[in-house]
């Protein structure tokens, strides 16, 4: 419960200096980067300051986005960002007040899901966010790796261009591709500035971005210089690799692997990235899997019908949601031909789960059968968890390449 001395309101331009200082303190960030980077994307009517008297002690914002869900459909999502509490004011209910304000606002406006990146993994499940809604795979691989003989590489020329030349093409390609990739988000102009910020403070000792265009895709990367008695040992740090076709994907990876003077490539990608099955020795590829998006079902009856499902099912779900009580209770969830109908019911429950477990499974990356084994899902009618698992599972692992 929030401290009764606290208040919450939306921000205006005059709040920005103090708002950014609180963010920098909480994230242990460089205030120079916070001022002009993250604040560019904030929507003032959806950004909140939590105050103790006149002092801002907490921050939070919601970005209006679309997320691609199974079936290639676009669903409005509240992308929760810059959630901070000023040191010295923890355990006063600051985060609870912010979360309640955000989620109740999304419910009233009809935004069916909320998403966020969690800086600390123990915080958000209690607010109904499901972990591992998407996963993020950090890969490192040595250059000069060969593809197996079945991978075609075309002679298409990949052009190295300026940022100004690249951006119009990249915007168009990204918007087409993100509509086909589960977990990808829409972008507004300010998002491009954040994702590809290229001031000195953004580079962490690396070079400025290189922009390389294929007719059906692009790659953006920085270089970390290195070397010694054995010669150059530069590293390529890929920021984005976006492709409309499998051929462009193979061509761009081959381009990166063959860059002179580089010895290693590092990049963040989907858990099921096909590059592991393209190279001739996948054991040389380093992998480090972690959580990415956390997803919160704001309205069960709105969110579940907005995606497509892999098999028919008819189950009664008993959902527990203490933070958004309109979701609590029993729902008949019926899928036929990939489309779902959700309605209140008094029938006995086949499966019980909390709203966070439902959020983890929503994009198809977490199996409800696994959550059952983890004691997060309870089966009352034998066979229903397996049937629901098959319905929710997607044809690919969900992935969100964009931190917000």
Give residue spans per PLM region:
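Intrinsically disordered, low-complexity, positively biased terminal segments
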Residues: 1-16, 70, 149-404
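Hydrophobic, small-residue-rich alpha-helical packing segments that form membrane-like cores
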Residues: 8-13, 23, 48, 93
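Active-site rim helix/loop that mediates acceptor-substrate recognition in acyltransferases
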Residues: 24-70, 183-210
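Conserved beta-strand in the GNAT
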Residues: 49, 55-64, 79, 84, ...
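Conserved acetyl-CoA-binding loop-helix of GNAT-fold acetyltransferases
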Residues: 82-85, 91-104, 246-257
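Conserved active-site alpha-helix within GNAT-family acetyltransferase domains
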Residues: 107-112, 117-138, 272-287
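Glycine-/small-residue-rich beta-strand-loop submotif within the FAD-binding core of flavoenzymes
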Residues: 137-151
